[in-house]
Amino acid sequence: MRKPVLWIVALVVVIAAGGGGYYGWTRLGDYSGQQFRTGLDQWIKTLPPGYSMTYKTAEYNVATDKATLGGVALKGTGTQVFDATIDNVEVTKPSADFANAWAQAAANPAALAPDKALPVAGSITVKGATIHFGAASGTMASAKLDGLRLYPWALLHSGVPSFTDVQAALTAKRTEQPQLADVLPLLRFEASILLGIGYDTYAVEDMRVTATVPATPQMPATDVTYTIRKFGGSGYDRGVRGDAELEGATIAAAPMGTITIERASMADLKFQQPLTQLLAGDPPVPEMLDGLAIGKIEYVGMKATTPDGKEIPVGTVSISKIGFSHGVPISGELGYAGLKLSKALMPDARSREAFDKLGLDTLTVSLGFTYQWDLDQKRMTVRNVALKIDELGALNLSADLADMTPGAGWQTRGSLSHVLLRYDDASLADRAFKAAALETNADPAALRQQVIAMVDMRAASLGDSPAIAAAVAALKSFLGEPKSLTIELAPPAPVAFSALQAAGALPPGDIAALIGLTISANK
């Protein structure tokens, strides 16, 4: 989604810089449109070999401090082959000294401060943009960018490869499995761009991108079409993003199918610190993730359509509160709801038979979890690890772990402090008894009693400790009238993972005492 927008932004920036580069925006009040066109024409003559630009109209309104270009066409015929056109460009309140400030920055980039910004314009509006590049093309009905500014410290940073160099490096490895070293030039180039721009707000309407992806041994050739009705946001600055929203996205990949997204949003994304390290040429290591944060990313109303036209409601997914420290994830939340699995969409007879045995045509699935790791306290908490199938039941897990330190071998160093597992039955138990009875030609009620009797028989070999007896009673109660079953582990003191691994040799009663086992039903 970002690439076509960056192409247009880059085009507008060079137009703005070129138009005022010879005589300066400050003199437009004296010369108005004619001087603007003269400066623009002279700048066009300085384009590198393989690039050309034309325009049909170019005007400057002194009263509104607005430059307007019509019928803009820009072509690349060298290493980067592309063809871009824009029906109309409006630049309001262009920076009076952008060209001079940029020239000064380029003359001594080592002296630049990372947060030194060069304002480009108060507002830039683009209408009717089209670009063709290779096997891809993009169109945009309109786009508006307010408060665009550039940070030459990043854009002119020493050692950053050019886009041509990045393309050459990737092309050379196209027939091989790419390694991390192969994509480092691309990562560094993109870090320069993302750290080199900022803007106050943006809004785009009716964007469409099409591309043909060549066939691979694993996949056929694919025609991809990506459309968005509108998207916009506010507050992006050097790798720190505020709010952004999208409405009406469709991704069609023939012949594989289509995905539609009713709405998407993101907020409070921070990746300035990792980008700065990449820009400096630091090798990627886990600690580079420190400082990366995701406030929230959410996709609402997702739907997939199969090649034969069948629709699959995918639902809503969100990730939030993602944070890292010392190279490990220390917090995060995941939520997913609304996936509908239909018997009619199952690809094989065995799957459809499973639906029939349960007496269902559709399963509605949701899941989620919340995670935190306090590295100073060496404590990890996991909450609401939930899997819910509306038609069958819901499983929910919470856990507290102690002595958790990052690094290899953590599974031998940690300790279990508390675990709570709860199952709330909607109909699964009764459906399972009915399905089993149907296969064995038995009565469901009689089969239920047989299973309860088997629990009693098995319990006899587990000893007569109070914890075991209470667990058996709870399990029998649940089987007789399935509503809920809760399993809690609350040891008197945290139990090391190594001790848990060795506990298999202990008598059942001793194991129950070690882990503080409690099982209750229908509470």
Predicted regions span which residues?
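N-terminal Sec-pathway targeting helices
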Residues: M1-A17, G21
